[in-house]
Amino acid sequence: SSSIDLSIALFASWGTPARVVGYRGTQAKIRRSDPTYYLGILNPRIAHVMCATEDIKQQLARFISPDRMTVSPKPYEVMWMEDVWAHPKSVAGIPSTAFQVICLANTKGRSFKGLRILIRALELLTDTDIHLIYLGEYDKADYKLAQNGPAAKQIHMLGPHKDAVYYLPGKDVCICPSTRDASPRSLREAMACKVACIVTDIPGARDLVVDGRTGIIVQAVSPQAIAEGIRVLAADRAKTKMMGEAGYQRIRTDYTMEEYVRRLKGVFDAIMTK
């Protein structure tokens, strides 16, 4: 729930026996001195809080008792990608032999998403046949950086696309270069498309990837580390493909809607018996 939705639920249930369960999917700062937080996530009337990641629970533990929180990662069903598999999209101008890295993120006004760092990483790979496909909103300054830099021919800035996920099938790597993030949906989508993942070592995103098995985890805020990670996977395409297959099995078995509903029902049952 958003802060506004949670506040509305608290006001609407005032004076009723209804129990309010909150959801926290971000590591955004919480200020105890700011009274508006007590209209939402810090309100003592909240019976329980569902946290998207363990790191979020640890952050909230400064304000909320751990026994009032449950970690429940967002689910993803591979069947949601059936139409994507049936109608994949490609990018014109990229050689069929190229190693294709894709990034799905809206970075306009959000420098923490790491697009500029990723562009700098590609500039360290101009001696390769590695191409970056970027889909999402971006700042003009980042576009100019990409188009005026030494890797311009290897960077394809496609902008926002409602059908962005249709570009995932057949790509070699999906990358999340963020300096902070929660638990990116794009990584789940990539895993459901059997695409290996490279993520920065930040809370939330790193939980999705098993380092060395479904992808690799690299140092954050480091174009050099990102470039080296891409180079390593490009040098062993067979292993990269195996990582994509392993990621598919992980998302298919560990992030099911059935398991998510089971955890949620367990929380509801426990609250109602108190």
Locations of regions flagged by a protein language model:
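Short His-centered aromatic/hydrophobic patch
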Residues: 1-6, 24
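A conserved, positively charged/aromatic
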Residues: 14, 20-47, 63
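Donor nucleotide-sugar binding/catalytic pocket of nucleotide-sugar-dependent glycosyltransferases
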Residues: 45-83
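A conserved mid-protein helix/loop that constitutes part of the nucleotide-sugar donor-binding site
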Residues: 99, 109-124, 188, 224
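Aromatic "clamp/platform" in nucleotide-sugar-dependent glycosyltransferases that forms part
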Residues: 160, 179
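Short hydrophobic beta-strand element within catalytic cores of glycosyltransferases
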Residues: 196-199, 209
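Conserved acidic donor-binding segment of nucleotide-sugar-dependent glycosyltransferases
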Residues: 211-212, 216-223, 232-237
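A short, well-ordered alpha-helix in the C-terminal region of glycosyltransferases
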Residues: 225, 232, 239-254, 260-266
